[in-house]
């Protein structure tokens, strides 16, 4: 399989599109630090352009030329304080400079199709009450294969957002599997306000950890977050995310040593993790099928051992 073409876009200097009123901007080791706690929300911090008039901007275009009708995956590598306080806008223009369409990106990644009528585009990095920002790069990857066009990035299904005053959330980390069906919505409703996180191993695990962490931290009304897992890989992932968030994790005793070692080696900040409140609701020695047959059975069955009433403050959602 041919490797997809990837363009790396960086922020190399202060330009006319950089918001500089009261801002402190520094460039070091491939990172840009932007600090301005007084910057109004809704204004662009910086812009990247595909077309520029050199006489006006005194610099070359910073975005690659994209092919019409082609699919691309864009990934934004950055950290904002507070979490969720920076987002991106992709604006497409036709030949006469009229705005054609707009994409608003509030996560780290998005897959787009470059419009057939588009002549140019630009990307704005927007402020939403951010006090500081560390920006590393933007990557634009051309999706050239059918597998890529059906790209399976991390998926978060949200159910029952209005349950329990919206101040408590149960986040179920699905065990990766191409064999077993996904957890049904009817089963998920037992957990009240619940997010189901799937396909977190299909792409950039480090990026998925960061995205999930940011998404949860942006839920300002939450008083409690419970992470729930039920398999060897999901247990490792859930425990790691819970350590970043300082929240409670409910898991089984199963653990994938290879994944645990990989996270320790490849994901930054492993040595700075917070203590996690871990409750093991099922231990491996309890498994009546503890033999080669156990590996053939859907591990979601272990969730039957979890006392759901503990998760929702003593309540069980029976609707």
From Swiss-Prot:
InterPro entries: Acessory_Sec_prot_Asp3
Keywords: Protein transport, Translocation, Transport
BP-aspect Gene Ontology terms: protein transport
Gene disruption: observed consequences: No effect on cell growth, significantly reduces export of the cell wall protein SraP. The small amount that is exported seems to be glycosylated normally.
Superkingdom classification of source: Bacteria
Keyword Protein transport tagged: yes
Function per UniProt: Part of the accessory SecA2/SecY2 system specifically required to export SraP, a serine-rich repeat cell wall protein encoded upstream in the same operon.
Subunit structure as annotated in this protein's UniProt entry: Part of the accessory SecA2/SecY2 protein translocation apparatus required to export cell wall protein SraP.
Family according to the record: Belongs to the accessory Sec system protein Asp3 family.
Protein name: Accessory Sec system protein Asp3
Source species: Staphylococcus aureus (strain NCTC 8325 / PS 47)
